């Protein structure tokens, strides 16, 4: 009976020894992993304290963003800011991204849960090739674990690149809420003060005759300008902050009309405003031709000009509508 007991005791001791030996490399690897993670976080915090948007090249991107371990998210803006790239949108997007990163860096909620970084094409073209990226600017959120999903790529053409819109997207992807604080802009108050001063000066100079305040033509023109601005999508631009236009980085072709019905460019607003103004002017000419007391020749010319303006600008307007709402069956003169 002693021999089996001795045998089983030796087996138990050997099993415990093997278990302890197997745990030693695992514990050592865990400590090494924690040390690497601590070094990466410390390095990122040091850079973020100096500059909220960390500039990265290929080596930094692979080591700090792609390679594990990570317990932080990195929102990376891929851009092309060099002058010879002629990317106007990249400059505008960079300004908004800097505002967002500064708002996070100097907020009371600032932690090491999320960092902001930037990869310029001329400093990290290998990163663009690695990610099969062929357009800029592009915003991607790299989560702490796993690869970025489709929703981790910011829809720039739909949302625009305003800091507030990017902050909402970041809150959806990381649960980190950032309150955007913009630097004070005194242009608006100065222009308002100048406008009030001009109006006050006119009222003072014409204080003996205030009939101009009851001028129907003046009020009608002001109301028409307001209506044209609102119907062209100016308020949407103010809320979303879209780019002025989009330049294809490969062909250099500039698009002023967005191809989707869910978004628009600032230039598109100006074009629609111009077309609406042309249709309005044509209608005014037609009304004047029908009701004025001028001779028949001038009235005929006004009628022809009015019809031409309405037909031409309405046809252009309808062609823009067809380009944005694919499958729309109707057209007029132009397709």
From Swiss-Prot:
Biological or metabolic pathway of the protein: Protein modification; protein glycosylation
GO cellular component: endoplasmic reticulum membrane; oligosaccharyltransferase complex; plasma membrane
Residues on Extracellular side: 30-184, 231-270, 322-335
Annotated glycan sites: 71
Signal peptide start-end: 1-29
Free-text tissue specificity from the UniProt record: Expressed at high levels in kidney, colon, heart and liver. Expressed at lower levels in intestine, spleen, brain and lung.
Keyword set includes Metal-binding: no
Family: Belongs to the OST3/OST6 family.
Function per UniProt: Accessory component of the STT3B-containing form of the N-oligosaccharyl transferase (OST) complex which catalyzes the transfer of a high mannose oligosaccharide from a lipid-linked oligosaccharide donor to an asparagine residue within an Asn-X-Ser/Thr consensus motif in nascent polypeptide chains. Involved in N-glycosylation of STT3B-dependent substrates. Specifically required for the glycosylation of a subset of acceptor sites that are near cysteine residues; in this function seems to act redundantly with TUSC3.
Record protein name field: Dolichyl-diphosphooligosaccharide--protein glycosyltransferase subunit MAGT1
UniProt source species: Mus musculus (Mouse)
Organismal lineage: Eukaryota, Metazoa, Chordata, Craniata, Vertebrata
Gene this chain is encoded by: Magt1
């Amino acid at each position: 009976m002693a021999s089996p007991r001795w045998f089983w005791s030796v087996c138990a001791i050997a099993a415990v020894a093997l278990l302890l030996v197997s745990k030693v490399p695992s514990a050592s690897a865990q400590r090494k992993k924690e040390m690497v993670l601590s070094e990466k976080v410390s390095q990122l915090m040091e850079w973020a304290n100096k500059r909220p948007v960390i500039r990265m090249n290929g080596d930094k991107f692979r080591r700090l963003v792609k390679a594990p371990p990570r317990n932080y998210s990195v929102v990376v803006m891929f851009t092309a800011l060099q002058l010879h790239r002629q990317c106007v949108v990249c400059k505008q997007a960079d300004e908004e991204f800097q505002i967002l990163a500064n708002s996070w860096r100097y907020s009371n909620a600032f932690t090491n849960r999320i960092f902001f970084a930037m990869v310029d094409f001329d400093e990290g073209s290998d990163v663009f090739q690695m990610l099969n990226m062929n357009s800029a600017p592009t915003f991607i959120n790299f989560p702490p674990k796993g690869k970025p999903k489709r929703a981790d790529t910011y829809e720039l053409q739909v949302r625009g690149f305003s800091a507030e819109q990017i902050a909402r997207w970041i809150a959806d992807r990381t649960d980190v809420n950032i309150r955007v604080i913009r630097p004070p802009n005194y242009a608006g108050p100065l222009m308002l003060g100048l406008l009030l001063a001009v109006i006050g000066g006119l009222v003072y100079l014409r204080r003996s005759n205030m009939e101009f305040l009851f001028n129907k033509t003046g009020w009608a023109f002001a109301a028409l300008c307001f209506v044209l601005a609102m119907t062209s999508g100016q308020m949407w631009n103010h809320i979303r902050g879209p780019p002025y236009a989009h330049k294809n980085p490969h062909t250099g072709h500039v698009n002023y009309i967005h191809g989707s019905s869910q978004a628009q460019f600032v230039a598109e607003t100006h074009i629609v405003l111009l077309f609406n103004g042309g249709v309005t002017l044509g209608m005014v000419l037609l009304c004047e031709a029908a009701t004025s007391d001028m001779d028949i020749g001038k009235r005929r010319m006004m009628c022809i000009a009015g019809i031409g303006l309405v037909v031409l600008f309405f046809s252009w307007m309808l062609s823009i509508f067809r380009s944005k709402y694919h499958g729309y069956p109707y057209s007029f003169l132009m397709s």
